[in-house]
A protein has these predicted regions:
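Segments of small-molecule ligand-sensing domains
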Residues: 173-186, 197-253
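Extracellular/periplasmic periplasmic-binding protein-like sensory domains
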Residues: 113-190, 254-256
Length: 258
């Protein structure tokens, strides 16, 4: 249940991934940065698996979209201050900052940026699709834009769609069972179980690992929390950019970005 591409890229052929992968989300967010008219970006990421993997994809994709990376700064998971890195960013001619992290340090980075007077638009990915991020950053998160799955706001699918029915039913049953709304990690776990059950139904009696993998690779059009999954021998994530949406934090809550 991780968004790094290393999950399926390094451990194939027996590992499948339900979160929106970096190879899916990074170009989606970079395109949004370009569409906003920016051509020079600063990248700040953590040195954990999600951040390191994301930066690899960012460096591959940014030039293809005509985006120049004018700063590339990192911090370690657990760091309580990112001022030094942001000071370097402030000294560049960056027009936007792409923050790639999944930890609480993302909120710290935004607070540090506002304290330093880094008056640049900040962008991110699925690592910020958590209420803890918006709450932790407080007013510093105002205007932050990030890309992640449409299911963060089920109504994005349209209330008469199968996707909306699946996601809203999952959310209702989760709240009834646990007394709180599900986060994205609960949704990814739900997808893993759904996909496994679907594949087991097609894998024959008493399937071994190879038979189960083969069945998973033939998964087609299974609707889950993350979107519509269609696996193949070359794609163990199975999602597309049609399953994504762009959000903006406004008043401490996320709304669809205009």
């Amino acid at each position: 249940m991780a968004g790094g591409t290393v999950v399926t890229g390094e451990f194939d052929p027996l590992v499948f991934q339900t979160p929106w992968s970096n190879t899916l989300v990074v170009p989606y967010v970079l395109a949004a940065i370009k569409d906003a008219g920016h051509t020079k970006i600063a990248v700040i990421s953590d040195t954990g698996g999600y951040g390191k993997d994301g930066v690899v994809v960012i460096k591959e994709q940014a030039p293809e979209l005509g985006l120049a990376i004018v700063a590339d700064e990192t911090f370690n998971p657990g760091d309580s201050d990112v001022t030094a890195q942001l000071t370097k960013v402030k000294a560049t001619d960056a027009q936007a900052v792409l923050l790639w992290t999944a930890g609480k340090e993302g909120a710290i980075a935004l607070k540090n940026a506002r304290d330093l007077g880094v008056d640049l638009p900040f962008y991110g990915g699925s690592g910020q699709a958590r209420t803890e991020f918006a709450e932790g950053a407080g007013a510093a998160a105002e205007g932050f834009v990030f890309g992640t799955g449409k299911s963060l706001v089920p109504e994005n699918w349209g209330q008469n769609t199968e996707e909306y029915a699946v996601v809203s039913d999952f959310a209702t049953r989760y709240e009834e069972a646990y007394g709180e709304a599900p986060d994205i990690f609960a949704g990814h776990a739900f997808d893993a179980v759904t996909l496994l059950a679907d594949a087991l139904g097609r894998a024959g009696d008493d399937p071994d690992a190879t038979a189960l993998r083969d069945a998973l690779e033939k998964t087609e059009g299974v609707v889950g929390f993350g979107g519509t999954f269609t696996f193949s021998p070359d794609d163990h994530n199975g999602l597309t950019q049609k399953d994504l949406a762009l959000y903006k934090i406004q008043g401490g809550k996320w709304i669809l970005a205009p």
